[in-house]
Structures are given as structure tokens and as C-alpha cells.
């Protein structure tokens, strides 16, 4: 490699199954690896002698299944007990162990047992992509723009940034995959000043995003985004693998579930069959000596493949409906529907999408495997001042956060500070106060999600604001300041206004227990469960009203001047009603109606008592 440092920043699409790298030098170039392939498998293999990354790792996977690691993107930024992690562990041939609540990958390397974090495995893939670029450019690469699914949460974004740092890269920006693809499409389509609504449908190997953008000239504004960080080509392969596994068992009586090598060979054949069925209507899967000397041969038609995956294919339309709803536009107002990600080559996926948009012609003008890296390279050139042509010089990218951010208030009620689909970077403020007299510490638990009840959302982290001057409840003014940077990474600061005391947290190591089901359904659940959310909010509101009224009655009854004016019988009745109200407050199961009735009964007793003075 020649001396010197590359002044620009490369663009890396770090994919679940394949990765791609691009550079910008007056125009974007997708860089092929040493095998001449423009995409590189996101695989890392460990042997007694060496470590292999990319094609070399994937090619030996069947011979060394337990030490060949893939799908690191499905682990990154997730907790070990995440539902999707637990489900994936069952199908992976490599071992995943738990350490401090985080998943680690255990392999045999250089004849020793070693463990690696998902960030480390991802950093190895990033290093490979960096080396591919350096071989082409002839200079050392230090800066990169790395892409993530739009629906990645705070923990997953931060972990990806960390992987870049481990790979020796200064990650200038984390950008969303569909937004990067939109840049590739928007520039390729020729810059038009006419306003266009463009829907990016990005179905890759392991993740799925839908983003709706408004493109006007060089300004790309994301209006809404939705998706599933655990849906892609891998899942279609898995369903096909299950189908053939049963077929093999029916034919031979052999169950290959516990044979990692047989499973890897069958998965590779399934991936090949899936690709064949995108162009042909049927294909044959043939594997010599799959298990116990038994050969396996089976035919599969496109129709059968579509049937096996019909539920997953149909589920891709839910985020499409969601973004249209969030962006408040009808499907007829969408000017272009752009396909991104290798899995959009599947004819059935295309047909469902086209039918949804009333037979609309889908945009296939950009390469679905390369568009994301292309857009990342353009962004890299802009951030390093290397963009030379007019198209890219004036380009402005306005992205959004995928899920609301906020804090838990008394009663575990979620108080959103930054609503979902807010353009980033952003700073939002919200004022809070104390709930008890002379309270000197307030805890700020920070959540991400769409539900009223915080337990239904993801806890990202928590911090305390201490040394608040002791005052009556409700008097201190505490301001929570949420700053989301252009990477979508959050910093929260709380300030007590009278003293200027502050505490803050950068949510860099989020607790990250967002299960796939929660991510997938968070927004649709918020609608489906709106009634229970409303009931939760109403109950909390009534409880607060009762608590406030009880406190005022207690102060009246205990005030020597006021209580002396009450007849004993009236005072007894008020105290009895007060006791009932306190009991209602103590019962966990009390409903909003129970609190309302208790408040009414207490009000009656007080009104009567005061009238008989």
C-alpha cells in the first residue's frame, strides 16, 4: 500500500449476511474484493491456524460450522435474554454464552477457547471492508460512514459505532440504510426541483426497513420510518430449511437437527434454491451424503416456496401502511416505490407491494445490493469536503428517530420528550417537578417506545439528579433536556433551575432488552392496546386527583382551628370517609372508577360536615 492517508471517508453497508464498501472520487465506485465480488459475506471463521473473513470464511463453513460466525448484526446491541437472541441461538451452529447480561460468541481459535462480543465480530467484518478499500485506493483509510437499519434502537447504533472504533475507523456518521439508498436513487434519477414522495422498501438478509422521504432538489427529508430489525432473507431460508429437514426425515427417518455440518450444507442449498426461484419457477436441491451416508434430492416450485413463506411476505406490508399513516399521505400520493436489499428480488414480494400500490410499477433502477453503500460513500464525501460535483455539494439529509424517547413519571407513566419521527439532530426539553415534600433526589429512568405504561417500553438507562434544595412537592423546576445527535444517539441532561445543578447520561450502554416482537409490534400495539393504555392513563389521573384531595382534607381535619369548628359526629364521618379513601389508594387493583367513587364519598362527607358546623 502506498504511503499517505485517504482524505475522504469510505461508505460501508454492514449487512447481516453480506457487506459492501464504496468510495467517492469525483464519482462513486463500489469496490470489489480480492475474489472480484462487489459484496462480501459478513462471515468470520476461526481455525487452529488462522482467522478468515468474508468469502474464505463462508466457503469453509460446512467443514467448520461451530467456529464460523455469522449474523452478528442480529446480536449487536441486544441483551442475552432478548427473545430474538434466544430464538436465534437454537438455530446457530456456533455457541453463544452470557456475560453480564450480554451475549458473547464462543469459538476454538489457535487451539484455545476464546469469546468475542458481537461488536468485535462486526469490527472484523468492518476491518475486512476497510482493507478492500485500501487495496483499491492505495492509501490508508481512517474515516467511514457506516449504515444501520432505520429501526435500530439507541443501543444497537452505539454498539455499531463501537465496532467501527474497534476496527480502527473514525465513524463520522451512522446513517440509516433506507436513507442512504434514497441518496443513491435521488442522485441517480437526475436532480429535479420537483417535489417527490419516495417510498424506500429495504428488505435485506436480516433486517427490514420502510422509509418515506420527501425529495425536493438536493433536500432529502425523511417523513416517517418503520420496520423490523429481525426479518429478511435468512428467515426465508430458515423456513425452506425446516421444510426440507422434514422431507429428509420422512424419506430416511433421520433427523439432522443436531448435526451442524448437515444443517450448514442444507442452508447453503436453500439459499441457492431461493435465488434460483427468483428467475425460474422450479429448482432441485441435491446434496450428496447429507447425513449418515444418505443423499438428499428434492424438487421445489416457486409456488411452494411462496406458500412456505406467505405469512412473512404478507407481514412486509404492515410497515408500509404504518409509514403512510405516520406521514399522513395516501398511497396514491407516493410518486415512486424503490426496491433495496437482495430479498426484494423475490417475485412474490414485488407482486404484493405492486398490488398494494394498485399495480404501480416498482423502481428497480438502482442495484439493490449496492445502493446503501453508494449513499454512504456520498455522505462520506460531503462530511469530509470531498464532494466535487453540484449534485452532491448541495445535498442535505434530514433523518428521523424511529421510536419516541422520554422518561418515566410517577405511576410509571411514560412522558415522551422526543416524539417518534422527529427530525435529527434535535434538542427537546420538558419540565418536571418533585412528588414529595423536601425531596432532594429525583430519578430519571429513560425509555424508548410508544406505550403509556413504561413497562411496555425499553429501558435505555437511568440517572439521579441529586442535591435538589428541599422544598414543598411541586415547587422545584426540573428540566429534562434530550439531545439526539445526527447518528440517532441520545444524551439526556436534567437541570434543577434554581441552583443550576445538573446530571446527565449518554445512553451508550443501553440495557437493550427490546425483544423482536416488541420492536415489530410497538407502534401497531400502541394502537391495538390504545384502550388499555387509555385506561392506564385515566386510572393514574383519577388516583392523583384522589391523592391530592385526601391530602387537602387531612390538612383540614388536623388543623386545630378548623377542626374545632366541626361537630364530633361530622368529624367522625369525614375521618371514616378519609379512611375508606386511603384504603382504596392502597389496593393495587383499584380502578379509575373506584378512585372516582372514593373521592365523591369523601366530598359528600366533607360538604355535609361543613354545612352542620
Swiss-Prot record:
GO cellular component: cytoplasm
Keyword Plastid: no
Region (Substrate binding domain (SBD)): 403-613
EC numbers for this chain: 3.6.4.10
Residue span of motif Nuclear export signal: 574-582
Gene3D superfamilies given in the database record: 1.20.1270.10, 3.30.420.40, Actin, Chain A, domain 4, Substrate Binding Domain Of DNAk, Chain A, domain 1
The reaction(s) this protein catalyses: ATP + H2O = ADP + phosphate + H(+)
PROSITE patterns: HSP70_1 (PS00297), HSP70_2 (PS00329), HSP70_3 (PS01036)
Gene Ontology molecular function terms on file: ATP binding; ATP hydrolysis activity; ATP-dependent protein folding chaperone
Subunit structure comment from the entry: Binds to ribosomes. Binds close to the ribosomal tunnel exit via contacts with both ribosomal proteins and rRNA. Directly interacts with nascent polypeptides. This interaction is dependent on the ribosome-associated complex (RAC). Interacts with SSE1. Interacts with FES1.
Protein name, as recorded: Ribosome-associated molecular chaperone SSB1
Originating gene: SSB1
Amino acid at each position: 500500500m502506498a504511503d499517505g492517508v485517504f482524505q475522504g471517508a469510505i461508505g460501508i453497508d454492514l449487512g447481516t449476511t453480506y457487506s459492501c464498501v464504496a468510495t467517492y472520487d469525483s464519482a462513486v465506485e463500489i469496490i470489489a474484493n480480492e475474489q472480484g465480488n462487489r459484496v462480501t459475506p459478513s462471515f468470520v471463521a476461526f481455525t487452529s491456524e488462522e482467522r478468515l473473513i468474508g468469502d474464505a470464511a463462508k466457503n469453509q463453513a460446512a467443514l467448520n460450522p461451530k467456529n464460523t460466525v455469522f449474523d452478528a448484526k442480529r446480536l449487536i446491541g441486544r441483551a442475552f435474554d432478548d427473545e430474538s437472541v434466544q430464538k436465534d441461538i437454537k438455530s446457530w451452529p456456533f455457541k453463544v454464552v452470557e456475560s453480564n447480561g450480554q451475549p458473547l460468541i464462543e469459538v476454538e481459535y489457535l487451539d484455545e477457547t476464546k469469546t468475542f462480543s458481537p461488536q468485535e465480530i462486526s469490527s472484523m467484518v468492518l476491518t475486512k471492508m476497510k482493507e478492500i478499500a485500501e487495496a483499491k485506493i492505495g492509501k490508508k483509510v481512517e474515516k467511514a460512514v457506516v449504515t444501520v437499519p432505520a429501526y435500530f434502537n439507541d443501543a444497537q447504533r452505539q454498539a455499531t459505532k463501537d465496532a467501527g472504533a474497534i476496527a480502527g475507523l473514525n465513524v463520522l456518521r451512522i446513517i440509516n440504510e433506507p436513507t442512504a439508498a434514497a441518496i443513491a436513487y435521488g442522485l441517480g434519477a437526475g436532480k429535479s426541483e420537483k417535489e417527490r414522495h419516495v417510498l424506500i422498501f429495504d428488505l435485506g438478509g436480516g433486517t427490514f426497513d420502510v422509509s418515506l422521504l420527501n425529495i425536493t432538489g438536493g433536500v432529502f427529508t425523511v417523513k416517517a420510518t418503520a420496520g423490523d430489525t429481525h426479518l429478511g432473507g435468512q428467515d426465508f431460508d430458515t423456513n425452506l430449511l425446516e421444510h426440507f429437514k422434514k422431507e429428509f426425515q420422512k424419506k430416511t427417518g433421520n433427523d439432522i437437527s443436531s448435526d451442524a455440518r448437515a444443517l450448514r450444507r442444507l442452508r447453503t442449498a436453500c439459499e441457492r434454491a431461493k435465488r434460483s426461484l427468483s428467475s425460474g419457477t422450479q429448482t432441485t436441491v441435491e446434496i450428496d451424503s447429507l447425513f449418515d451416508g444418505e443423499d438428499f434430492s428434492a424438487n421445489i416450485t416457486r409456488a411452494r416456496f411462496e406458500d412456505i413463506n406467505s405469512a412473512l411476505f404478507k407481514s412486509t406490508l404492515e410497515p408500509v401502511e404504518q409509514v403512510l399513516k405516520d406521514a399522513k399521505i395516501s398511497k396514491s400520493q407516493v410518486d415512486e416505490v424503490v426496491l433495496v436489499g437482495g430479498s426484494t428480488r423475490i417475485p412474490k414480494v414485488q407482486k404484493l407491494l405492486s398490488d398494494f400500490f394498485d399495480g404501480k410499477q416498482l423502481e428497480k433502477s438502482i442495484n439493490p445490493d449496492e445502493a446503501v453503500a453508494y449513499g454512504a460513500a456520498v455522505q462520506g464525501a460531503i462530511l469530509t469536503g470531498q464532494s466535487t460535483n453540484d449534485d452532491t455539494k448541495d445535498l442535505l439529509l434530514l433523518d428521523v428517530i424511529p421510536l419516541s424517547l422520554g422518561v418515566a413519571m410517577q405511576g410509571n407513566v411514560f412522558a415522551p420528550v422526543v416524539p417518534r419521527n422527529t427530525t435529527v439532530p434535535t434538542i427537546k426539553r420538558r419540565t418536571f417537578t418533585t412528588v414529595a415534600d423536601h425531596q432532594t433526589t429525583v430519578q430519571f429512568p429513560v425509555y424508548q417506545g410508544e406505550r403509556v405504561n413504561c413497562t411496555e417500553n425499553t429501558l435505555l438507562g437511568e440517572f439521579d439528579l441529586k442535591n435538589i434544595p428541599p422544598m414543598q412537592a411541586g415547587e422545584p423546576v426540573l428540566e429534562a433536556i434530550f439531545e439526539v445527535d445526527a447518528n440517532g444517539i441520545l444524551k439526556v441532561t436534567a437541570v434543577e433551575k434554581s441552583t443550576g445543578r445538573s446530571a446527565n447520561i449518554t445512553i451508550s450502554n443501553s440495557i437493550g432488552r427490546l425483544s423482536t416482537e416488541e420492536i415489530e409490534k410497538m407502534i401497531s400495539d400502541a394502537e391495538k392496546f390504545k384502550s388499555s393504555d387509555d385506561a392506564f392513563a385515566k386510572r393514574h389521573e383519577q388516583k392523583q386527583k384522589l391523592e391530592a384531595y385526601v391530602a387537602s382534607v387531612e390538612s383540614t381535619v388536623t388543623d386545630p382551628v378548623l377542626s374545632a369548628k366541626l361537630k364530633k359526629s361530622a368529624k367522625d364521618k369525614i375521618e371514616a370517609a378519609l379512611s375508606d379513601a386511603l384504603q382504596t389508594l392502597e389496593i393495587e387493583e383499584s380502578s379509575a372508577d373506584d378512585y372516582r367513587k372514593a373521592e365523591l364519598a369523601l366530598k359528600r362527607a366533607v360538604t355535609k360536615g361543613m354545612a352542620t358546623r
